[in-house]
UniProtKB/Swiss-Prot annotation:
PROSITE patterns: ARGE_DAPE_CPG2_1 (PS00758), ARGE_DAPE_CPG2_2 (PS00759). This is Peptidase T. Belongs to the peptidase M20B family. The lineage of its organism: Bacteria, Bacillati, Bacillota, Bacilli, Bacillales. Its EC number is 3.4.11.4. InterPro entries: ArgE/DapE_CS, Bact_exopeptidase_dim_dom, Peptidase_M20, Peptidase_M20_dimer, Peptidase_M20B. Keywords: Aminopeptidase, Cytoplasm, Hydrolase, Metal-binding, Metalloprotease, Protease, Zinc. One of its GO terms (cellular component) is cytosol. It catalyses: Release of the N-terminal residue from a tripeptide. The active site is at D80, E174 (proton acceptor). It is found in: Cytoplasm. It comes from the Bacteria. It comes from Staphylococcus aureus (strain JH9). Its cofactor is Zn(2+). Zn(2+) 1 binds at H78, D140, D197.
Length: 408
C-alpha cells in the first residue's frame, strides 16, 4: 500500500489549494475546486455516487454490503491548505528508511532536525514525505484525504470485509475556520463521523478548546505634541495598557495541556485609533466565560478614567469544546479505541489545543472526533508525512467500519 499512498499524496499535494481569509466566497479560493473536481472524478471511477454542491462540499457514499441495520459512519477531511506559508509549486521529497539524522530540505538552508523536532526520533526507519524547503507540504489535510480514499479502494477490492453505509466528505476552508459553515448535516446523513485531521501516531481527540475572538478598539485624541498636556489621548498607549492588564502567564508560549490563554494576534494603530485582536481559548466552559468577562472588566476599568469611553470591545464566539457533545455518546470513542487496541496502536486522548471541523460539526448535530494522520509541523516548510503511519491510519478506517458492522 505504501506506493499507492506516496503516489496519491504526491498528486494531491502538488495541487495548490491554499485558502484565503480575506475572501468572502465559499470556497475562499477558486483553486480549491481543482482538487475537489479531481476527487469527484476519482470517487465516481470507484463507482461511488457523489454530490458536489455550489459551496465546494463533496459528499460520496459507499453503500452497505450487509443486511443488518447499523449506524452510518462518516469520514471527513479538508481540501484547503494553510495561508500561513507558500503553498504553490510544492515539490514533495521522499526519504526512504529515515535514519534519524538532520535532513537538508532541497537547496534551502532549512534543515529538518530531530533536535528541533524531537518527534522525528520516533520515525526512524519510516518512509517520509517532506518539502524542498520552499513551501509547505499540504499533508494537512491531504494525508487525511489520501487515507480515506485508500481505505475506500481497499474496501472495494475486498468485498469480504463487511461494513454498513459509509459517508465521505471533503470540505473547503477549514484552515480559515469556515469548514463547517455551509456543511449540510442533513444532506451528509451520517449518525456520527471522524475527521482524519490529527497529527501524531495514536491521536484520538474528542476534547477541543472553547474559542472566541475579541477585537478591542481604542479611540484617541490627537493634538500637537507640543501642546498635548491634559488634552492628548494616545490610542496606542491605551492598547498597551489594556494588554498589560491581562495575566502575563496566560499566553500560548507559557501554557500547555488544559491551560487556557489570551493570545494577542495583531496590534496596530496610531495616536487617533488602535486595534488589538485577541483569540481566547480554554477547555473549561466556566473558565472560558470568565476569560471573556475579564476582557470586559478591563475595558470598564480603563473607560472609568475617561468621559467619552474610548475603549470598545467586540467579542464573538468561534467554536466550543466538542467533548460536551461527544462524551454523552461513549460508543463513538469506544469504537476507535477497540480498533487501536486490535492494531496495537497506543491511544493518545490528550485534548486538542485548538479546534477541528469536528468542534463545530459536533454542535451542529454530527458528533465528530479526530483521528491521527501521521503528519507533523503543519503550516510551514518543515511539514512532513510518515507513509508508515498513514498506512496505519488507513487500517484504522477499515477497522472502524468493520467494528460497526460486527458490534452494532
Amino acid at each position: 500500500m505504501k506506493n499507492q499512498l506516496i503516489d496519491r499524496l504526491t498528486r494531491y499535494t502538488t495541487i495548490d489549494t491554499q485558502s484565503d481569509p480575506k475572501s468572502t466566497t465559499t470556497p475562499s479560493t477558486e483553486k480549491q475546486w481543482d482538487l475537489l473536481h479531481l476527487l469527484e472524478k476519482e470517487l465516481q471511477q470507484l463507482g461511488l455516487p457523489t454530490d458536489l454542491d455550489e459551496n465546494g462540499y463533496l459528499f460520496a457514499t459507499l453503500e452497505s454490503n450487509i443486511d443488518a441495520d447499523v449506524p452510518t459512519v462518516g469520514f471527513l477531511a479538508h481540501v484547503d491548505t494553510s495561508p500561513d506559508f507558500n503553498a504553490s509549486n510544492v515539490k514533495p521529497q521522499i526519504i526512504e528508511n529515515y535514519d534519524g539524522k538532520p535532513y537538508k530540505l532541497g537547496n534551502t538552508k532549512r534543515v529538518l532536525d530531530p533536535k528541533v523536532f524531537p518527534e522525528l526520533n520516533s520515525l526512524v526507519g519510516h518512509t517520509l514525505m517532506v518539502t524542498d524547503g520552499t513551501s509547505l507540504l499540504g499533508a494537512d489535510d491531504k494525508a487525511g484525504i489520501v487515507e480515506i480514499m485508500e481505505a475506500i479502494c481497499y474496501l472495494q477490492e475486498h468485498p469480504e470485509i463487511k461494513h454498513g453505509t459509509i459517508r465521505i466528505g471533503f470540505t473547503p476552508d477549514e484552515e480559515i475556520g469556515r469548514g463547517p459553515h455551509k456543511f449540510d448535516v442533513d444532506r451528509f446523513n451520517a449518525d456520527f463521523a471522524y475527521t482524519m485531521d490529527g497529527s501524531q501516531y495514536g491521536e484520538l481527540q474528542y476534547e477541543s478548546f472553547n474559542a472566541a475572538e475579541a477585537v478591542i478598539t481604542c479611540h484617541g485624541v490627537n493634538v500637537h505634541p507640543g501642546s498635548a498636556k491634559n488634552a492628548m489621548v494616545n490610542a496606542i498607549r491605551l492598547g498597551e495598557q489594556f494588554d498589560s492588564l491581562l495575566p502575563d502567564s496566560e499566553v500560548p508560549e507559557r501554557t500547555e495541556g488544559y491551560e487556557g490563554f489570551y493570545h494577542l494576534m495583531n496590534f496596530e494603530g496610531t495616536v487617533e485609533k488602535a486595534t488589538l485582536q485577541y483569540i481566547i481559548r480554554d477547555h473549561d466552559k466556566k473558565q472560558f466565560e470568565l476569560r471573556k468577562k475579564r476582557i470586559l472588566e478591563i475595558r470598564d476599568d480603563i473607560n472609568a478614567h475617561f468621559e467619552n469611553y474610548p475603549v470598545k470591545v467586540d467579542i464573538s464566539d468561534q467554536y466550543f469544546n466538542m467533548a460536551e457533545k461527544i462524551l454523552p455518546l461513549p460508543h463513538i470513542i469506544d469504537i476507535p479505541k477497540r480498533v487501536f487496541a486490535k492494531l496495537d496502536i497506543p491511544a493518545n486522548t490528550e485534548p486538542i489545543r485548538g479546534g477541528t471541523d469536528g468542534s463545530q460539526l459536533s454542535f451542529m448535530g454530527l458528533p465528530t472526533p479526530n483521528i491521527f494522520t501521521g503528519c507533523g509541523n503543519f503550516h510551514g516548510p518543515y511539514e512532513y508525512a510518515s507513509i508508515d503511519v498513514m498506512e496505519k491510519a488507513v487500517q484504522v478506517i477499515i477497522g472502524i467500519v468493520e467494528d460497526i458492522a460486527e458490534n452494532h
